[in-house]
Swiss-Prot record:
The active site is at C145. The keyword Cell cycle does not apply. NCBIfam families: argC. Its EC number is 1.2.1.38. This is N-acetyl-gamma-glutamyl-phosphate reductase. The keyword Cytoplasm applies. Belongs to the NAGSA dehydrogenase family. Type 1 subfamily. It catalyses: N-acetyl-L-glutamate 5-semialdehyde + phosphate + NADP(+) = N-acetyl-L-glutamyl 5-phosphate + NADPH + H(+). One of its GO terms (molecular function) is N-acetyl-gamma-glutamyl-phosphate reductase activity. InterPro entries: AGPR_AS (IPR023013), AGPR_type-1 (IPR000706), NAD(P)-bd_dom_sf (IPR036291), NAGSA_dehydrogenase (IPR050085), Semialdehyde_DH_NAD-bd (IPR000534). It is found in: Cytoplasm. The gene is argC. GO terms for biological process: L-arginine biosynthetic process. The lineage of its organism: Bacteria, Bacillati, Actinomycetota, Actinomycetes, Micromonosporales. GO terms for cellular component: cytoplasm.
Length: 333
């Protein structure tokens, strides 16, 4: 018998990707998948790609999770904390929502609203010392999708003194799956196709998470909705230190990271190369004319930005190689 796994919030995009990864994992046994409005439906009627998984979606209730050794929470922001508080302390929990990412209650109230639920171990294992903290934890907060792409691009450069922590500017495009599966008029194909649209300009909720993890002191972030189902491409710029080689700094930082790839000089990340994988692709240079350091980061928002990273964290928590059940290679075209 494998490690018994429950997925809460299984009807959404991240939940569906979690189910796909768990079902193919050699050490995980999917015992429960729960949902709200879709409870009572057979799993394959909600996620047609999962035909062959003979499960009925259960109501989201702590009692339905009693037999699980490991629980993934793929719920909307603000809904994970109350449920997590009712789970046994020995149950390992990975929260894909934002409820437990931030240390600062003021930042939580300012960007999300409501009561701060407290911080869990932050699940970006490539940060210094973080893999060991995740391994020792029973509660892990999975990073946000944009936050993952930007932190992986920026954190080593600030830590090494290669980039100044002030005056960081980011523009990042994301596929529409990042907005969730709920029906919304502005996400209809007729609205999205052939269009690029910025949103939450200067006020995106991942800003405090990025600053917390990187040490950036000022960050201007413009997210852009792109006409594609999934993927994130982030362009991060900062003031460089004199004579810095940002590609070398990143290559050294991620030399032992199986899911972070610093591309050869002259090649730049693009979203299609990461789709279906748990990898983040990075490239960096210095714009001498503008005096700016530029890093481009690409990943699959549902993979490395959500479900894949959650499985990576779970692997570390239960003592498995972090690569177990995950692919470092994308599917293209």
């Amino acid at each position: 018998m494998g490690i018994r796994v429950a997925v809460v919030g299984a009807s959404g995009y991240a939940g569906g990707e979690l189910l796909r990864l768990v079902a193919g994992h050699p050490e995980f046994e999917l015992v429960t998948a729960t949902a709200h409005s879709q409870a009572g439906h057979r799993l394959h009627t909600v996620h047609p790609q999962l035909i062959g998984l003979d499960l009925v979606l259960a109501e989201t209730d702590p009692a339905a999770l009693a037999d699980a050794d490991l629980v993934f929470l793929a719920l909307p922001h603000g809904e994970s904390a109350a449920l997590a508080a009712q789970l046994p302390p020995k149950t390992r929990v990975v929260d894909l929502g934002a409820d437990h990412r931030l240390a600062d209650p003021y930042a939580w109230a300012n960007y999300y609203g409501g009561t701060h639920a407290g911080q869990w171990t932050y699940g970006l294992s490539e940060l210094p010392g973080q893999r060991e903290r995740v391994a020792a934890a029973t509660r892990v907060a999975n990073p946000g999708c944009y936050a993952t792409a930007i932190i992986l691009a920026l954190a080593p450069l600030i830590a090494a003194g290669a980039a100044q922590p002030a005056d960081v500017v980011v523009v990042a495009a994301s596929g529409v799956s990042g907005a969730g599966r709920a029906a919304k008029a502005h996400l209809l194909a007729g609205e999205v196709m052939g269009d690029l649209s910025p949103y939450r300009v200067g006020a995106h909720q991942h800003v405090p998470e990025i600053k917390q993890a990187t040490g950036a002191t000022s960050l201007s972030f413009t997210p852009v909705l792109a006409p594609m189902p999934r993927g994130i491409l982030a362009t991060v710029t900062a003031v460089p230190a004199r004579g810095v080689d940002p590609q070398a700094v990143l290559a050294e930082a991620y030399a032992d990271a199986p899911f972070v790839h610093v591309l050869p000089e002259g090649r730049w990340p693009h979203t299609a190369a990461t789709l279906g994988s748990n990898s983040c692709h990075l490239q960096a240079t210095v714009d001498v004319d503008a005096g700016r350091l530029i890093v481009v980061s690409g990943l699959d928002n549902l993979g490395r930005g959500a479900a894949g990273q959650a499985v990576q964290n779970a692997n570390i928590m239960v003592g498995l190689p972090e690569t177990t059940g995950l692919s470092a290679w994308g599917v293209t075209p």
